[in-house]
Amino acid sequence: MLELNRLYNMDCMEGMKMIDDNSIDMIFTDPPYGHNNNNNGDLISRREAALGKGEYVPDRDNRAIMNDGKEADEIFKQMIPEMHRVLKAGCCCCCCCGGGPDPMFARWSLWLDEVFKFKQMIVWDKGPMGMGWHYRRSYETVLVAMKKGAACKWYDETHAIENIIRPRYKGIRKIIPSKAQHPTQKPVELAKFFIVLHSQEGETVLDPFAGSGTTLIAAKQMKRQYIGFELDKQWADIATARLEEAKNQTTLF
């Protein structure tokens, strides 16, 4: 078993092989899903966006995401059996899946249900999107599936949890792109929302696609153990720095 409370700068397919069967209590992850890419899998310029070739992302040359092109589907499909293997029975796998014209959520839901028991598609309402044209992306999805063999691990029996996460009452806000360190960075509070529902203090949370470390920070702040993998050294270094900052903030209080 790998050492806990660490981010590993390596391919998650290789790293997962070093995790014992039935040893993880919860997975929350944001895999590459082709967000903001053109047909070549490249983040595109403002001019290309204006010509209808995709959605503009600032600083594209420094913010590219590995394996975020057409290969994203295949990578996710290959990961499903490994995520299932390491999870304990009754535990949940929560996967962010974007929101947009590509019905990726439909494909991924069906693939998850072939191995897990598909539980729900959660809609994260990101609030008003401002000025624009055509359909604006005001939501993203999170797919929740559980490993069969035991009752679903659910740790909030006092509230009816809607399948729409609305920012006005959950305290979860959309990250302003210019302030994000990763092009698809999620709010720490979003990860906390799922971590608290599907795990307890001291249990282990896994993020195979850690990016800039949001899931790991949320796990740390909620007193969970964690393991994360990130292939790209650029993002792994940023995640490590964010984790160290979170650790220092914790010791202040």
Where are these regions (language model features)?
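Core catalytic lobe of class I
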Residues: 1-229, 234-237
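Short, conserved SAM-binding/catalytic segment
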Residues: 1-2, 240-253
